[in-house]
Structures are given as C-alpha cells and as structure tokens.
C-alpha cells in the first residue's frame, strides 16, 4: 500500500493518479500525555492503521493526486540516519572533484571507514513543500537516495533478520551545502531532507537491493543507478545502524547517493524516481 500525508495533515492512500482520503483511520492511534514518545505513532501502529484503512477504502473520497500538496509520509521520526559515500562510483567523483571534497580527507572515505551520521529532524520536508536553498553563495547539491523507514524497535539486529524491522520505503533527497564543515551541519538546513512522495509498505518491495533510481534537474538526467550498487545494502545498513543506535518506529535511514550529484539553483525543478515507489517533483526556491 502507498500511504501519504497531504494538505493539512490528511492521511491518504495513493491509487494511480488519485488519493483516497482515509484520515478517519487515524482514530486508531492512541492519545499521549507529556512527555511524548520518541517514535512516530503512526508507524508504531501501522498494522492497526492499515486494518482500519481497509474498512474505509471502498467509500473514501477521491482527490486527484495533482491537486494535493504532499507532506513527508513520516511526520515524527526519532532520528534521521544518513549514509555517506555508499556507492563506489560516487566515491570516485568525490575524489575527483575538489568542490565536493573541499580537501577534507574524511570526506573521501567510504561508509565502512566513516560510519553513519545524523541529520536534524527539522530538515525534514515533503515533496510538495520543496527545498528552500540555504547559503546561496555556496554550491548546493542534490543527492537522490532510497529511504528506509523503520517499523519496530531494533537493537543489534543481524542482517538476515533486518528487513523484518522495516515498515516501508520512500524516495529521499539529501540536499547538501558544500563546504569544509561536518556533514551533519551542512546537510541539516530546513527542507534539506525531502522524504516522499509516499510510504510504500514493505510487502510491496521484496527486493530493495534491486531498485533502479534516477534524478533529473529541469529534464536533464543527473543521476541514474541501481541499489544493487550499494556498498552496504539495505540489510547491512539496518544491521550497522542498530549496532550503534536503538532504532525506533519511524526512524529513517537514507542509504547514500550514487554518482551524478550536482548543483541546483532557485527556479530549478528536480524529478526523482525510484522503481516500485514512484516519482516526485521538488521545486527549488530561495529562502
């Protein structure tokens, strides 16, 4: 199932070029008192939510997908975990381009040496919200990635069981301000983590390591790769992340970008696509 959030926090199921409004299904979520939990309640109770949705779909109001404003399908992740260089060809382009590596040795190490990093939750936005470019005196780059949404609490999960802890998948855009500062700092301005266009539940993608992905800017193909080229695949990423962090429902792991990263400017439009997930268009604007 393809689950989306749209407009003023409405809940929808995507069916072709339409969205079925199933916001009523949110009634299955429990109410909370302060302090609020450190996980996403919708993802935590996804099974109950899906069961309720099934009872609503037949009579749900239908809206054209083109007429809705898509928000991030995960509203409250406990953390956003990001993978640095996780494609060999991306490592090669980083080594070759001083505008990317800025002469910092740690920026030219692949994931097995550099580990993972965190992005600020406040950087999260949906496809319909677009990207507000920060620090336009610097180069701002796009990076398309497969995003993994954790479905249940996980700690020290072996790779052979790791997919059991996944709720589903999205397209992720990891925007980056180029410079010498630490990755987390340069990748965490507001709207620099785009998640969307919706959450595709795990049952619809049995082989996340075999997905074709691409990104175009103003119609020009910039990135085109397959998740089979990941250095650490989805299973290994969940294993690796859970060996350092306790993963909670709604935590997001963005798996790293392939080669072809490049700059964007206000007025540009990015079209990102991942096989079996869908496509999303993201507008670039000034802050």
Swiss-Prot record:
A divalent metal cation binds at residues 143, 145, 174. It is an enzyme of class 3 (hydrolase). Its EC number is 3.7.1.23. Signal peptide: none annotated. InterPro entries: Fumarylacetoacetase-like_C, Fumarylacetoacetase_C_sf. GO terms for biological process: catabolic process. The keyword Hydrolase applies. GO terms for molecular function: maleylpyruvate hydrolase activity; metal ion binding. It comes from the Bacteria. Disruption phenotype: Disruption mutant can still grow on gentisate. It catalyses: 3-maleylpyruvate + H2O = maleate + pyruvate + H(+). The keyword Hydrolase applies. Optimum temperature is 30 degrees Celsius. Optimum pH is 7.2-7.7. Optimum pH is 7.6. Involved in the degradation of gentisate. Catalyzes the hydrolysis of 3-maleylpyruvate, the ring-cleavage product of gentisate. Homodimer. Belongs to the FAH family. This is Maleylpyruvate hydrolase. It comes from Aquipseudomonas alcaligenes. The gene is hbzF.
